[in-house]
UniProtKB/Swiss-Prot annotation:
GO annotations of cellular component type: cytoplasm
Pfam families per the UniProt record, alphabetical: Coprogen_oxidas
Role according to the record: Involved in the heme biosynthesis. Catalyzes the aerobic oxidative decarboxylation of propionate groups of rings A and B of coproporphyrinogen-III to yield the vinyl groups in protoporphyrinogen-IX.
Annotated site (Important for dimerization): 175
Record carries keyword Disulfide bond: no
Catalytic activity as recorded in UniProt: coproporphyrinogen III + O2 + 2 H(+) = protoporphyrinogen IX + 2 CO2 + 2 H2O
Organism: Xylella fastidiosa (strain M12)
GO molecular function: coproporphyrinogen oxidase activity; metal ion binding; protein homodimerization activity
Protein name, UniProt field: Oxygen-dependent coproporphyrinogen-III oxidase
Annotated spans, Important for dimerization: 239-274
Entry's localization field: Cytoplasm
Residues the entry annotates as binding a divalent metal cation: 96, 106, 145, 175
List of residues binding substrate: 92, 108-110, 257-259
An annotated GO BP: protoporphyrinogen IX biosynthetic process
Length: 305
C-alpha cells in the first residue's frame, strides 16, 4: 500500500470514529452523508448533523482531491512548487454546539503531495486543533492543553511549545487584535520523516477525541438564557470573519476550484453582528477578553496549584 493510501485509510476511519462519538453524545440527530466528485479530479464525503440536542451543527468532511497547478495559497511557503501537479487528502471538522457554555471547536489533519513529470517532488503533513469558548472555564482550557502536551511528548520536548505557539500565531484576527480562541496545536510543512510525521498526525487526530468530548460532556447541560445565546451568536461572527479572511484551508479550497458547499460548511448556521458592541464591565461576557490572547495555560495552572 502506498504512503498516500495509508494516510487516506486512517483519515476515513478517523471521520467514522468521530461521527460515532458525536451521535452518541447528541442522542437525537444523525449525520447525513453527501458523496461528491470534483470535475478537476478527486472527491470526498461530507457529513453534517443539524439541530441536535447538543450540536446545533456538526460538520466533518473527508476529501481526496488532485489538480494540475498548485494554487497560490499552497505554494506561498514553497514557491519552487508553483504550478506543480498535486494531490491532497484530509479531514476537517467544525462543531457548533447549541449551548453557549460548550466551546466551538475545529480539527484539521491533512497530507499533501506534489509531482512533476509523474515523480513526487514534495510531500508533507499539516493540521491541528483549536478551541473557541464563549464562556470559558479554566478547567476546560487546562484539560485541552494537557491533552495537547501529552500527545506531543513522544515527539520531543519542544513539540508542544512550538506547535502551541504556531497555533497562537495562526488563529489571530489581526483586524480585531484578538485570537480566535484559547489555541491548541497547529503545524504545517511536516516533511522530515514520513513514519514519524504520520505517527504525529495520528496522535493529533486521536488526541482530539480525548481533548474535546470530555468538555462537551461536562458543559452541555449548563443552564443558559437569551443573554448567553445572543452573545454566542455575536461571537460566532468572529469565527466567520477568520474563516473568510485568513483561513488557509478555506482560501486553498476556493482558489483550487473546490466544492464551495463543503468548504463553507464550517460557517455557523446562525450568527449576528452588532455595531459598537461592548460587554458590561465585570460581566461574564467581558471576561472572555482575558482568554483571547496567547497564554501559557499549563504554567499558569501549575503556579495556582
Amino acid at each position: 500500500m502506498s504512503d498516500f493510501d495509508r494516510v487516506r485509510d486512517y483519515l476515513t476511519a478517523l471521520q467514522d470514529r468521530i461521527c460515532n462519538v458525536v451521535e452518541t453524545i447528541d442522542g437525537q440527530s444523525h449525520f447525513h452523508e453527501d458523496h461528491w466528485q470534483r470535475t478537476e479530479g478527486g472527491g470526498g464525503r461530507t457529513r453534517l448533523l443539524r439541530d441536535g440536542a447538543v450540536f446545533e451543527q456538526a460538520a466533518i468532511g473527508f476529501s481526496d482531491v488532485c489538480g494540475t497547478h498548485l494554487p497560490p495559497s499552497a505554494s506561498v511557503r514553497r514557491p519552487e512548487l508553483a504550478g506543480a501537479n498535486w494531490r491532497a487528502c484530509g479531514v476537517s471538522l467544525v462543531f457548533h454546539p447549541k449551548n453557549p457554555f460548550v466551546p466551538t471547536t475545529h480539527l484539521n489533519v491533512r497530507y499533501f503531495r506534489a509531482e512533476r513529470e509523474g515523480k513526487q517532488v514534495a510531500a508533507w503533513f499539516g493540521g491541528g486543533f483549536d478551541l473557541t469558548p464563549f464562556y470559558p472555564f479554566d478547567e476546560d482550557v487546562v484539560h485541552w492543553h494537557r491533552v495537547a502536551r501529552d500527545l506531543c511528548a513522544p515527539f520531543g520536548d519542544e513539540r508542544y511549545a512550538a506547535h502551541k505557539r504556531w497555533c497562537d500565531e495562526y488563529f489571530v484576527l489581526r483586524h480585531r487584535n484578538e485570537t480566535r480562541g484559547v489555541g491548541g496545536l497547529f503545524f504545517d510543512d511536516l516533511d522530515k520523516d514520513f513514519e514519524r510525521d504520520f505517527d504525529y498526525q495520528r496522535a493529533v487526530g486521536d488526541g482530539f477525541l480525548d481533548a474535546y468530548f470530555p468538555i462537551v460532556t461536562r458543559r452541555h447541560d449548563t443552564p443558559y438564557g437569551d443573554r448567553e445565546r445572543a452573545f454566542q451568536l455575536y461571537r460566532r461572527g468572529r469565527y466567520v470573519e477568520f474563516n473568510l479572511l485568513f483561513d488557509r484551508g478555506t482560501l486553498f479550497g476556493l482558489q483550487s476550484g473546490g466544492r464551495a458547499e463543503s468548504i463553507l460548511i464550517s460557517l455557523p448556521p446562525l450568527v449576528r453582528w452588532e455595531y459598537g458592541y461592548h460587554p458590561l464591565p465585570g460581566s461574564a461576557e467581558a471576561r472572555l477578553a482575558d482568554y483571547l490572547l496567547p497564554r501559557d495555560w499549563l504554567e499558569e495552572s501549575r503556579i495556582c496549584e
